Amino acid sequence: MLAKRIIPCLDVRDGQVVKGVQFRNHEIIGDIVPLAKRYAEEGADELVFYDITASSDGRVVDKSWVSRVAEVIDIPFCVAGGIKSLDDAAKILSFGADKISINSPALADPTLITRLADRFGVQCIVVGIDTWYDAETGKYHVNQYTGDESRTRVTQWETLEWVQEVQKRGAGEIVLNMMNQDGVRNGYDLEQLKKVREVCHVPLIASGGAGTMEHFLEAFRDADVDGALAASVFHKQIINIGELKAYLATQGVEIRIC
């Protein structure tokens, strides 16, 4: 059995790490490189960096900090933000990133997933999915351009359909960003994760809602996700990664102990 992964998420805007609630009202957390180094030293299994306004601004992720991160950490990291071409991806990987993640650009051009997978291998192609639960319809819908409130829109894709589509096209991993839960720290959306797990045959990463160590345990135990991504509980030092991993190990979760 592969070890479960703990993945701090760093949302980047204007060269700094920020964090919002339900993808809105972002506050500045701190500088990118020191935070990345801290999380690596605490025992994170990998890091994810989202340049949250790159796609909505029509630009590629700011590459200046990618190489600096690569110099100070010795764990894998993934970079996302406005990657719309093979050249964009190649540059980010050449600066030291281990994986690239696409989200809004994949919705705009689903063939991008296949082209990236064919060129670089499925192991480094992650597809992020921003999913919103509509209480009126009882359905989960994929959203696009979520880094900019004024441009965020609901797509024609229902979440389960898009999960299956991106796998067919070559996604090597899926990060499910559950927007309703984002930043509120009352637990992952386990029901949604279970439904996605049934149709997801590549590694699945839960994102949005972690507030306690028990929330991580529930995601691993009840929804069988491969990794759990979180931001505010780590940024605000509510949970220490080393202590979290020790707790999960006592609960029988296969985890890499620091």
UniProtKB/Swiss-Prot annotation:
Q: A Pfam family this protein belongs to?
A: His_biosynth
Localization terms from the record: Cytoplasm
According to its UniProt record, this protein's enzyme class is: lyase
Give the metabolic or biological pathway. Amino-acid biosynthesis; L-histidine biosynthesis; L-histidine from 5-phospho-alpha-D-ribose 1-diphosphate: step 5/9
What Gene3D superfamilies does the database record attribute to this sequence?
Aldolase class I
Does the record bear Lipid biosynthesis in its keywords? Answer: no
Instruction: Give the disulfide map.
Output: none
User: Does the keyword section mention Cytoplasm?
Assistant: yes
Could you list this entry's UniProt keywords, alphabetically sorted. Amino-acid biosynthesis, Cytoplasm, Histidine biosynthesis, Lyase
EC nos? 4.3.2.10
What this protein catalyses is: 5-[(5-phospho-1-deoxy-D-ribulos-1-ylimino)methylamino]-1-(5-phospho-beta-D-ribosyl)imidazole-4-carboxamide + L-glutamine = D-erythro-1-(imidazol-4-yl)glycerol 3-phosphate + 5-amino-1-(5-phospho-beta-D-ribosyl)imidazole-4-carboxamide + L-glutamate + H(+)
Where does the record place the catalytic residues?
11, 130
Gene Ontology molecular function terms on file: imidazoleglycerol-phosphate synthase activity; lyase activity
Self-association and partners: Heterodimer of HisH and HisF.
Family, as annotated: Belongs to the HisA/HisF family.
State the name under which the record lists this protein.
Imidazole glycerol phosphate synthase subunit HisF
**Gene of this entry:** hisF
